[in-house]
């Protein structure tokens, strides 16, 4: 699915097939040594050899020619953890 600039997507554990060129999915959420939330997300085959990447609030990732910025990681130590990403490019 193509997204407009400014569109927001929620990424939880498992697959999210709403990303053009995806899927993108959450693999793990936790707090780092400084108490900041971190997420490990998996992406499409063109992310090889890094199938999974660690992201923090403010980081960006690209999928399907679209660039996304992580705006929040919620309840990182909960089974209901998720992150929010906004399309910026």
Which residues does each predicted region cover?
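Surface-exposed, beta-sheet-biased, low-hydrophobicity segments with strongly acidic/polar composition
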Residues: 1-89
């Amino acid at each position: 699915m193509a997204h407009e600039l400014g569109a927001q997507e929620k990424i939880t554990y498992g697959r999210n097939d709403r990303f053009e060129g995806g899927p993108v999915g959450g693999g793990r959420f936790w707090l780092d040594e400084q108490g900041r939330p971190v997420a490990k997300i998996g992406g499409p085959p063109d992310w090889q050899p890094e199938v999974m990447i660690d992201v923090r609030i403010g980081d960006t990732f690209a999928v399907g020619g679209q660039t996304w910025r992580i705006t929040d990681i919620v309840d990182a130590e909960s089974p209901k953890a998720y992150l929010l990403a906004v399309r910026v490019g």
